[in-house]
Amino acid sequence: MHTVWKGSISFGLVNVPVKMHAATETHEFHFNYLHKDCHNRIRYIKKCPHCEVEVAAENIIKGYEYEKDHYVIMEEEDLASLEAPLSRSIDILDFIDLSDIDPIYYQKSYYLSPEEAAHKAYKLLCQAMSDTGKVAIAKLTMRSKQHLACLRIIDQSIMVLETMYYPAEIRHLEASWDNVSPTDTEIAMARQLIENLAAPFAPEKYRDELREQVKELIEKKVSGETYRVAAAPEPGKVVDLMEALRASIAMTDQKKQQNTAESETEEKPTKSTLTPRGRRKVKGA
């Protein structure tokens, strides 16, 4: 697995050298922009509007606009000097309960694996965190940014690091609908609908259906097949809330009964009988 960062986990006087690997990947289709007339790729030119010239990469520097059209120049050495003391350490600040973290704070997941000489220290930290049921809040510098992070243990022996947003980066939404109160009957029916739809989390049953359709469309176009563009669905009509709840509950009740019947059928032992010719015949075959 590709290593994206190397450093060490630091807590107290203990240091555990680790490597970081991306835990997720996207399966999006990446399209190129082409010139409609000749189908050649569009080129994006970095041009200075003042000098009216194309600017090469080695002549591009960083600047921060502190007021309109006024910049303070930031040299790479300036930024590197700030990062140097922090760049190779995951500093644990606190150990907390995972349930205390609102998922809105999570950004991206990474695996942490131990360096060859740190297997025992890594396993020790994993075991201690598993036994106490705690996760760690830490800070690290990666890609010119200091990240807040959560370290947690999965399968008792693998450490996952989740980068997190700082509180100042979380937007807040005011609930302008607090003056509306559903009736007790509506709440009871909504709860029943939720109970009907409740199920264990099985991630393998969820699919990116749009991606599958895009893949199929690309394959058809590459092979020269014709295709039909499906009509856009009609916008949903506003219906009575109680009627919608009743209909939804009835639909989920029917589906639950059907699933139960299918499960019972699968669990029944298959009975066999002897035919006049001595062959075994399976009932229902």
Swiss-Prot record:
Keywords: DNA damage, DNA recombination, DNA repair, DNA-binding. Residues 9-176 form the Ku domain. This is Non-homologous end joining protein Ku. Belongs to the prokaryotic Ku family. GO terms for molecular function: double-stranded DNA binding. Residues 250-285 are annotated as: Disordered. Homodimer. Interacts with LigD. It holds the Pfam family Ku. One of its GO terms (biological process) is DNA recombination. InterPro entries: Ku70/Ku80_beta-barrel_dom, Prok_Ku, SPOC-like_C_dom_sf. HAMAP family: Prokaryotic_Ku. With LigD forms a non-homologous end joining (NHEJ) DNA repair enzyme, which repairs dsDNA breaks with reduced fidelity. Binds linear dsDNA with 5'- and 3'- overhangs but not closed circular dsDNA nor ssDNA. Recruits and stimulates the ligase activity of LigD. NCBIfam families: Ku_bact (TIGR02772).
